[in-house]
Design a protein with these regions (language model features):
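A noncatalytic interaction/capping subdomain that flanks phosphate/NTP-handling catalytic cores
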Residues: 1-130
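Conserved glycine(s) of the Walker
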Residues: 133-136
C-alpha cells in the first residue's frame, strides 16, 4: 500500500490516504500515522447502539461519518480509518484534517482553538470561542 508523508499542524504524518491539501514531507520517523484498519472490538457496542461519537477522556476517541466510515484516534499518534461500502473520500479527507488531527493535538496536550478565520489579502483575523458563540 502506498505511503504518503506530510507536515500537518507541525507534525510529520505518515498516511495511507493522500491529502492534496497537505504540505508534502520527506519520509522519516512519523509522529502520527493514518492507517486503514478495523475498529477495536469494544467499539462495536457503540456502533450497534447508533452512537456517532465516543471518547475516553483525552486518550482516545471514535467517530462515524455520515457515509458510515469510522475513525478511531488514539494516543495522539494514530488514526485508524475503516471505510464504509460507499466512502465519500472528499468528506473523509476533510474530516481527518480537521476533527481527526484536532483530536490528535488534544491528545498530545497541544493547545487547539475552535475558530473562524478571515483573510483580506495581507491581513487576517481569527475569531475564537466556544461552539455556538457566533464565529460563523
Amino acid at each position: 500500500m502506498m505511503e504518503y508523508f506530510y507536515r500537518i499542524y507541525g507534525l510529520r504524518v505518515q498516511s495511507q490516504i493522500p491529502f492534496s491539501e497537505a504540505v508534502p514531507e520527506t519520509a522519516g520517523e512519523a509522529e502520527v500515522k493514518i492507517v486503514f484498519g478495523r475498529m477495536p472490538d469494544f467499539l462495536l457496542e457503540a456502533g450497534q447502539k447508533g452512537y456517532g461519537t465516543w471518547t475516553n477522556g483525552f486518550v482516545s476517541a471514535w467517530f462515524r461519518i455520515r457515509d458510515g466510515t469510522q475513525v478511531y484516534v488514539e494516543g495522539g499518534s494514530r488514526i485508524t480509518v475503516e471505510l464504509s461500502e460507499e466512502p465519500q473520500l472528499l468528506v473523509i479527507t476533510s474530516l481527518l484534517l480537521s476533527a481527526g488531527m484536532a483530536l490528535v493535538c488534544l491528545q498530545r496536550g497541544e493547545p487547539f482553538f475552535h475558530g473562524s478565520a478571515l483573510y483580506t489579502g495581507e491581513q487576517a483575523i481569527l475569531l475564537c470561542g466556544e461552539s455556538g458563540a457566533g464565529k460563523s
